[in-house]
Amino acid sequence: MALTKAEMAERLFDEVGLNKREAKEFVDAFFDVLRDALEQGRQVKLSGFGNFDLRRKNQRPGRNPKTGEEIPISARTVVTFRPGQKLKERVEAYAGSGQ
């Protein structure tokens, strides 16, 4: 089950005490700042959570799965995420609990 932006705003409403409009604006603003930083080519480091980086992928050969024809896959920039140690530990503890 995925966590949505609407659910994040609802949790802020429930746990922090922001009203629903403020909570939605807060979540939207957070992702706007994250997106803007990445668009500017900047790394985003969230202490205790992880890092978002941009990585350049060179052009490479690919294959059309329907025809088998070889086609080039264009060079591009992709966003990568590396979880921080605290996040890794919490996920591993949760996964180890059998839930």
Swiss-Prot record:
Keywords annotated in UniProt: DNA recombination, DNA-binding, Transcription, Transcription regulation, Translation regulation
GO BP, sorted A to Z: DNA recombination; positive regulation of metabolic process; regulation of DNA-templated transcription; regulation of translation
Entry-linked SUPFAM superfamilies: IHF-like DNA-binding proteins
Covalent S-S links between cysteines: none
Domain of life, source organism: Bacteria
InterPro entries: Hist_DNA-bd (IPR000119), Histone-like_DNA-bd_CS (IPR020816), IHF-like_DNA-bd_dom_sf (IPR010992), IHF_alpha (IPR005684)
Pfam families: Bac_DNA_binding
Gene3D superfamilies: IHF-like DNA-binding proteins
Cellular component terms per the entry's GO annotation: cytosol
Record flagged with keyword Transcription: yes
Keyword Acetylation belongs to the record: no
GO molecular function, one term: structural constituent of chromatin
Family that this chain belongs to: Belongs to the bacterial histone-like protein family.
Subunit: Heterodimer of an alpha and a beta chain.
Function: This protein is one of the two subunits of integration host factor, a specific DNA-binding protein that functions in genetic recombination as well as in transcriptional and translational control.
Name this protein carries in UniProt: Integration host factor subunit alpha
Organism expressing this protein natively: Xanthomonas campestris pv. campestris (strain ATCC 33913 / DSM 3586 / NCPPB 528 / LMG 568 / P 25)
